[in-house]
């Protein structure tokens, strides 16, 4: 696996990959569209499905980086198969370290059984690495994720980031497990706005929620299959060592 392309030094890298409720994927796509970010790099691997993305008659790779000075985004048009989780996580963090990022913020979903009863999903944060990251979350009014498991690419990137000394934050929005959740993505982006001082408008996510659900349902279906193999439902459990 290799990443082809260069990033912007001293920039935040936002990672949003297909996961529970497609929270990360929807968030990443919305950031790119809202800020008009251009493709700067892509992932090449034989572990990826044999897919290309065609947009306005131009060909793109399915897993790619977008960016500008100060901010980069990693998004994917395809599910992250379990066999891809470790090599992708390590490669992304290694590339981020080489490019001299300021830090990595991963956006993901934390599935809850009663999501249907919650009008405004909560967003929790995990801070790893530099001590001031916890202060950043507190100042942004993001609650700490106190106990539990996190499964998937976000978990690997957080762990690898900490090992390499890269400031790492994970934002987890309450969401549906196997149903696209633009509402959860909107809340995650509002938290991101507060953390980084951005002004990403989330109103389109809420206004076009049903359109987004229809447009992403096939990606959600294929992602759900991958999540089952990764035991994503394991996140409902409490760690035995800390009970």
What are these language model-derived features?
Residues 1-78:
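N-terminal short beta-loop-beta anion/metal-coordinating cradle
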Residues 18-22, 80-83, 108-113, 151, ...:
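Gly/Ser/Thr-rich loops at beta-strand to alpha-helix junctions
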Residues 29-33, 89-92, 186-189:
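Short, solvent-exposed amphipathic alpha-helical segments in soluble enzyme
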Residues 38, 93-104, 162-167, 195-199:
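Secondary-structure boundary elements
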Residues 41, 72-74, 103-105, 167-172:
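Hydrophobic/aromatic beta-strand patches that form the interior of the parallel beta-sheet core
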Residues 86-133:
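Internal, conserved structured core segments that host functional sites
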Residues 114-191, 195, 241:
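Catalytic cores of processing enzymes, dominated by hydrolases/peptidases
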Residues 179-243:
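A conserved C-terminal secondary-structure "cap"
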């Amino acid at each position: 696996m290799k990443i082809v392309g260069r990033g912007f030094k001293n920039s935040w890298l936002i990672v949003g990959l297909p996961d529970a409720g497609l929270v990360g994927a929807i968030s990443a796509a919305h950031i790119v569209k809202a800020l008009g970010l251009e493709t700067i790099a892509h992932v090449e691997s034989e572990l990826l499905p044999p897919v290309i993305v065609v947009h306005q008659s131009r060909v793109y790779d399915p897993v790619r980086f977008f960016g500008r000075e100060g901010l980069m985004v990693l998004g994917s048009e395809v599910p992250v198969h379990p066999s891809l989780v470790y090599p992708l996580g390590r490669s992304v963090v290694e590339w981020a370290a080489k490019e001299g990022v300021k830090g990595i913020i991963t956006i993901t979903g934390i599935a809850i059984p009663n999501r249907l009863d919650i009008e405004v999903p909560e967003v929790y944060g995990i801070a790893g690495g530099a001590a001031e990251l916890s202060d950043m979350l507190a100042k942004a009014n993001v609650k700490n994720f106190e106990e539990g498991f996190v499964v998937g690419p976000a978990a690997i990137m957080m762990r690898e980031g900490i090992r390499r000394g890269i400031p790492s934050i994970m934002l987890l929005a309450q969401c549906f497990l196997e149903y696209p959740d633009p509402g959860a993505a909107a809340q995650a982006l509002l938290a991101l706005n507060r953390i980084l001082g951005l002004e990403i408008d989330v109103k389109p996510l809420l206004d076009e929620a049903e359109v987004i659900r229809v447009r992403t349902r096939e990606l959600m279906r294929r992602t759900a299959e991958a999540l089952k193999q990764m035991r994503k439902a394991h996140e409902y459990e409490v760690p035995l060592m800390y009970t």
